[in-house]
């Protein structure tokens, strides 16, 4: 049922984006439409209807190209770093009756916003290189732990903390095991002699 109504729900996309006449509501409409198209594609793939999938994929491709053209035509947004620091500087410039901004605003007005926004930048755009490989995360964490604890690497483990805790135990555990083995052996001989 939905497959018959779906093509009517997705109008044809204009080929040339208007210069600056596009609104966020129109962009949201295309994003919602794209979501419906993706759901229809998935549904038709599950049903084995490849012809319908191809039609929906073509519409989705047109929508994506249109949105990309709009994004390319728009001026780049201001970077998030300078905006908060200028807002903080403007707040500090205005006199407050009896109120004083926290000292960290005065000491590092630009370092604070950069520290807040820098890690979020790659995540907002879905960078495939950052935070993708768990082994790289473990290695970075392991190196950080080694730097703090002065431990030399012996190999990859599940996580850096576990590795850092295992190495000292290995040395201690070996000594304890040897002592325990001698004691157990003596006790064992005594028990065997008693039988």
Swiss-Prot record:
Transcription coactivator that plays a role in the regulation of cell expansion in leaf and cotyledons tissues. Component of a network formed by miR396, the GRFs and their interacting factors (GIFs) acting in the regulation of meristem function, at least partially through the control of cell proliferation. GIFs are involved in the positive regulation of cell proliferation of lateral organs in a functionally redundant manner. Signal peptide: none annotated. It comes from Arabidopsis thaliana. Residues 171-180 have a biased composition (Gly residues). InterPro entries: SS18_N. Residues 166-195 are annotated as: Disordered. Predominantly expressed in shoot tips containing the shoot apical meristem (SAM) and flower buds. Also expressed in mature flowers. The keyword Transcription regulation applies. It holds the Pfam family SSXT. Belongs to the SS18 family. This is GRF1-interacting factor 2. Interacts with GRF1. Residues 181-195 have a biased composition (Basic and acidic residues). Keywords: Activator, Transcription, Transcription regulation. It comes from the Eukaryota.
